[in-house]
Amino acid sequence: MIEVLLVTICLAVFPYQGSSIILESGNVNDYEVVYPRKVSALPKGAVQPKYEDAMQYEFKVNGEAVVLHLEKNKGLFSEDYSETHYSPDGREITTYPSVEDHCYYHGRIHNDADSTASISACDGLKGYFKLQGETYPIEPLELSDSEAHAVFKYENVEKEDEAPKMCGVTQNWESDESIKKASQLYLTPEQQRFPQRYIKLAIVVDHGMYTKYSSNFKKIRKRVHQMVSNINEMCRPLNIAITLALLDVWSEKDFITVQADAPTTAGLFGDWRERVLLKKKNHDHAQLLTDTNFARNTIGWAYVGRMCDEKYSVAVVKDHSSKVFMVAVTMTHELGHNLGMEHDDKDKCKCDTCIMSAVISDKQSKLFSDCSKDYYQTFLTNDNPQCILNAPLRTDTVSTPVSGNEFLEAGEECDCGSPENPCCDAATCKLRPGAQCAEGLCCDQCRFKKKRTICRRARGDNPDDRCTGQSADCPRNGLYG
């Protein structure tokens, strides 16, 4: 029996509430500052895992104490998850990073049945939690004190622009009848829970978005992982497990002509997916993230009810906000179309800000309306898409692994990975001239850190871990030689 580790974190509210600050999510006008303090239940001297399977946070919001329970989202990545980028001469470089010990969690607030949470613990705490109907983002503050975090409400983030943002799918008003019919169906509690379904997701990042983030592969990877974690959390009430199967970044050029007309781009992307992407690895649904400004304030487009179709199980989404959550809502919205959902009708669905609203809101909900659930249930009943019946397997891969599994193999001096890595040549897996290392807690700018440099702060009664000066690895329990 595997024991679940329970970790308690106390978040002490800083003595003041900030009035305005620029965060990764944008300019926030009102926020609270909190300090995570970790208290581990591990026995004295035990090795601390990098990311625990389960955690518990205690903190205050608006003066009220809450308890946040988190569990690692163990199904977030497929077993053969891969990342692809391209060399300047056009060669495809595919890596298979180890993602088992990842840092993405989902959870809930104690004694709040409607609460949810989606948190990244990669570098501090970043994500959101829903408490008493309100959604609160949390993210680290870039201060000298690295433990400081901000908690705020989405409506306190200044708008990035005043133009309305909307889905480009044209409402099929004749489909209102299907809502009525679906709504008239009596669903037992068992049916309302929805059968378990699994969607293997492929994310493609176009060249415009790649350059938008300074051609920084790691930054894009982190952003996409956070998006998929959020999508997974939003789909949980439908009993859908989202698994990221592959990330393909067009680092040198676009492989289709990304046009201002979103449906045209979706058609081109669907053709490319059928011809190229599906031959690399099997997956159920693919989305293209782009920095292209679509016409008519469109931020996303997808085919309705075409999940599992080799050409039409696709969507195109503009990376329209600095807020990861807002883009993730759009991606979930377009996924909803592929699962048979139409836009919410204001008169019938009683939810102006739910996921399938045609226009995105500053107070965007992370919930599917009853109408969306009826559409989805009808789609499952009538179409019964086969590709989402089974959990992802290793046999879903149809290509040969290349490199980049975060382990050094025979002939490798460093693990092939991001093309912008200044220390490791991604094409040869060799250290670049003058480099001692490519990654590790004791590696800084391709050189070993000095002996006795702290690389991991003490926890409990354990001493600080310090670098040896001879390796990029950070030894445990203060053994630095």
UniProtKB/Swiss-Prot annotation:
Catalytic-site annotation from UniProt: 334
Cystine crosslinks: 308-387, 349-371, 351-354, 414-429, 416-424, 423-446, 437-443, 442-467, 455-474
EC numbers, comma separated: 3.4.24.-
GO CC annotations on file: extracellular region; plasma membrane
Prosegment residue ranges: 21-189, 393-410
Principal subcellular localisation of the protein: secreted
Peptidase M12B domain mapped to chain residues: 197-392
GO molecular function term, any single one: toxin activity
Source superkingdom: Eukaryota
Activity regulation description: Inhibited by EDTA and 1,10-phenanthroline. Is also inhibited by endogenous tripeptide inhibitors pyroGlu-Asn-Trp, pyroGlu-Gln-Trp, and pyroGlu-Lys-Trp.
Cell compartment(s), UniProt: Secreted
Pfam families reported for this sequence: Disintegrin (PF00200), Pep_M12B_propep (PF01562), Reprolysin (PF01421)
Needed cofactors: Zn(2+)
Motif stretch (Cell attachment site): 459-461
Keyword Zinc: yes
Keywords assigned: Cell adhesion impairing toxin, Disulfide bond, Fibrinogenolytic toxin, Fibrinolytic toxin, Hemorrhagic toxin, Hemostasis impairing toxin, Hydrolase, Metal-binding, Metalloprotease, Platelet aggregation inhibiting toxin, Protease, Pyrrolidone carboxylic acid, Secreted, Signal, Toxin, Zinc, Zymogen
Record text on cofactor binding: Binds 1 zinc ion per subunit.
InterPro entries (alphabetical): Disintegrin_CS, Disintegrin_dom, Disintegrin_dom_sf, MetalloPept_cat_dom_sf, Peptidase_M12B, Peptidase_M12B_N, Reprolysin_adamalysin
Residues with PTM Pyrrolidone carboxylic acid (Glu): 190
Binding positions for an L-amino acid tripeptide per the UniProt entry: 296-299, 357
Tissues and organs where the protein is expressed, per its UniProt entry: Expressed by the venom gland.
Record text on subunit structure and interactions: Monomer.
Protein family: Belongs to the venom metalloproteinase (M12B) family. P-II subfamily. P-IIa sub-subfamily.
Protein name: Zinc metalloproteinase/disintegrin
